[in-house]
Amino acid sequence: MFRIIAVSMMCLGLAGTAGAQDAQVVLGQKVYAAQKCAICHSIGETGNKKGPLDGVGTKLTALELHAWMVDAKGMTTKTKSTRKPLMRDYKLPKEDVDALVAYMLTLKATPKK
């Protein structure tokens, strides 16, 4: 009986975590739209093709994505990126940056046309 209760509680805990992660991804999508990221970036067929984000969730880690959002100039130097124009450093609240990172990590592959 104890084992059933323990497993049930673990499942409930995991469901709560997944729900919180889903909420953070949804917030990330809203921040992406509100900050007008599509002016410079694209996801699928939407946005500026010069800054594609398709598959970014498999190319960069959460720490790298975070660094690009808060210190783009530093990351440009660190990675020797030659992209023009350079992404500017955004002064977003930590919660918004975390949500954007969560959303970017879901972008695993180029959407099918």
PLM features per residue range, with description:
Residues I5-A15:
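Bacterial N-terminal signal peptides
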Residues L14-A33:
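Electrostatic cytochrome c docking/interface patches
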Residues V25-Q29, I39-D71, R88-D89:
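Gly/Gly-Pro-rich "capping" loops immediately C-terminal to redox-active cysteine motifs
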Residues A33-K36, G44, L86, D96:
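Short pre-active-site segment immediately N-terminal to redox-active cysteine/selenocysteine motifs
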Residues C37-C40, L100:
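Hydrophobic packing within well-folded, soluble alpha/beta domains
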Residues N48-G57, D71-A99, M104-L107, K112:
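Axial heme c-ligation environment in periplasmic c-type cytochrome domains
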